[in-house]
């Protein structure tokens, strides 16, 4: 999953888990889906999801405001809503800019680490 300009899909993530962790393809798919569902559920409840050395996903409330139709210029009310925001960590920012940060982003977990029961 390296290179520029490529869009990484769920299938790509599942394949990476399969290749690097050693789970079956079915288990890898279930694992990725479980992680994404947990993140989604937390955001639905208004919780912030903070992944160390990666970034934070959070929901922000936007109030009602007046916008403009770009074609006609007429004012249009925009309803209040919640939006999802991602704030990358300093380490992730450094990595995407080709700098080596002082922290580590460990993406290499063994099958034993992932399947270990929480204490």
UniProtKB/Swiss-Prot annotation:
This is Integration host factor subunit alpha. The gene is ihfA. It holds the Pfam family Bac_DNA_binding. This protein is one of the two subunits of integration host factor, a specific DNA-binding protein that functions in genetic recombination as well as in transcriptional and translational control. SMART domains: BHL. GO terms for biological process: DNA recombination; positive regulation of metabolic process; regulation of DNA-templated transcription; regulation of translation. Belongs to the bacterial histone-like protein family. SUPFAM superfamilies: IHF-like DNA-binding proteins.
């Amino acid at each position: 999953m390296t290179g520029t300009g490529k869009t990484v899909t769920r299938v790509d993530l599942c394949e990476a888990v399969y290749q690097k962790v050693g789970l079956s393809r079915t288990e890898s798919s279930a694992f990725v889906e479980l992680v994404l569902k947990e993140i989604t559920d937390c955001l639905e409840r208004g919780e912030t999801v903070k992944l160390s050395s990666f970034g934070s996903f959070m929901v922000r409330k936007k109030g009602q405001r007046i916008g403009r139709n770009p074609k006609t210029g007429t004012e249009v009310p925009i309803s209040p809503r919640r939006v999802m925001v991602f704030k990358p960590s300093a380490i992730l920012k450094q990595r995407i800019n080709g700098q080596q940060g002082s922290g580590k982003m460990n993406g290499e977990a063994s099958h034993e680490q992932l399947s270990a029961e929480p204490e």
